[in-house]
Amino acid sequence: MINYLKSFFLYEIIRGMTLTLKYFFKPKVTINYPYEKSPVSPRFKGEHALRRYENGEERCIACKLCEAICPAQAIVIESDERDDGSRRTTRYDIDMTKCIYCGLCQEACPVDAIVEGPNFEFASLTHTALIYDKERLLNNGDKWEQALANKLHKDYQYR
């Protein structure tokens, strides 16, 4: 009998409408994405970048630890020896379609050369645009250097 009265007086609909009215006048929790952006965690793993020293020389010493530790095998490195005996990369490619953004390459790097930056807006229509070469990675590093340095400084206690 009680179930009949509840269905006769549309109890479920009234209950649903009161819940809707309860939240109707409260402030919105959604963000108008392209125009508003939510804060990003300092430990966020985004687009990759290769960093340089203050004198402009690239940090990568071609130890290939990042290539060895990458579980997705997304990193390809070729190196050559310089006249002074040090090694530097001649090719540093990352296939971003394979990358799983685990951050192991960043953790393995002894000189903080490869880092995952704050940028997450790098969508593309073609596969070839998501294969990053050394120049693009260095440009990302130059573009985001201040943010990358701050990120590494904040994250230092966890490393």
Curated annotation (Swiss-Prot):
SUPFAM superfamilies: 4Fe-4S ferredoxins (SSF54862)
Domain 4Fe-4S ferredoxin-type: 51-80, 90-119
Span of the signal peptide: none
Record-linked Pfam families: Fer4_7
Keyword 4Fe-4S: yes
Catalytic activity as recorded in UniProt: a quinone + NADH + 5 H(+)(in) = a quinol + NAD(+) + 4 H(+)(out)
Protein's cellular compartments: Cell inner membrane
Entry GO CC: plasma membrane
Gene3D superfamilies (alphabetical): 3.30.70.3270
InterPro entries, sorted: 4Fe4S_Fe-S-bd (IPR017896), 4Fe4S_Fe_S_CS (IPR017900), NADH_quinone_OxRdtase_chainI (IPR010226)
GO annotation (BP), single: aerobic respiration
Spans through the membrane: none
Enzyme Commission number(s) of this protein: 7.1.1.-
Necessary cofactors: [4Fe-4S] cluster
Membrane topology: Peripheral membrane protein
Cofactor binding: number and manner: Binds 2 [4Fe-4S] clusters per subunit.
Residues where [4Fe-4S] cluster 2 binds: C70, C99, C102, C105
Family: Belongs to the complex I 23 kDa subunit family.
Subunit: NDH-1 is composed of 14 different subunits. Subunits NuoA, H, J, K, L, M, N constitute the membrane sector of the complex.
PANTHER family given in the database record: NADH DEHYDROGENASE [UBIQUINONE] IRON-SULFUR PROTEIN 8, MITOCHONDRIAL, NADH DEHYDROGENASE UBIQUINONE IRON-SULFUR PROTEIN 8, MITOCHONDRIAL
Protein's recorded name: NADH-quinone oxidoreductase subunit I
Organism phylogeny: Bacteria, Pseudomonadati, Pseudomonadota, Alphaproteobacteria, Rickettsiales
